[in-house]
Amino acid sequence: FDDNDVSEVVIHGEFPDACYRIGNSGFELDQANMVVTVWASALEYRGEICAQVMSPYIVPVKLGVLEEGTYQIKVRDVPNVTASLTINKRTTESPDDFLYAPVEGADIKKDAAGRQSLTLMGSYPYTFWGCLKIKEVRMVDKDDVLVIQPIMEHLDGEACENYKHSFDETFGLSAPLEGESLLHVRVLNGNSYNRFVSLN
């Protein structure tokens, strides 16, 4: 992230059974010491029949616009879990104004030769004229996080023939992912889609 972006931290784990639901989340910022403490709560519903299975959860916590520097990330009440977040100096005075695709799903797949590729799924918004399509996908892999920017363009005429609003497109990776990685996809309206994948 740059110092004119809305930064985000992602909390993930597993509930012991399906009786739990994600509750509220938030953060506390100690700017003087460059420390961000995040937290997320869980709601337990014991008055119903719950499947006795591990239930994964993922909670994105928006931190707002942070000043340049490297922050220590802590999790409230879990002192042994820490991470770092580097906020770079912005290269332009305004935030990125790309028109991102409304991605609703992302996955990493392997072909028969073991080569990895990224698949993005979603539905384009309707327009009064022409159509929207993904023009390019930029990816930055750093510290087990693959930041994905699916940039759309507005087209018309022949480019919109046989147009489908739903998309399921695959893109090659410049380098393979290993172990557990977070897919952080920038999407339309300033939001993000996040998913953890485990690759052996």
Language-model segment annotations:
Residues 1-200:
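Exposed, flexible binding/inhibitory loops of compact, secreted disulfide-stabilized domains
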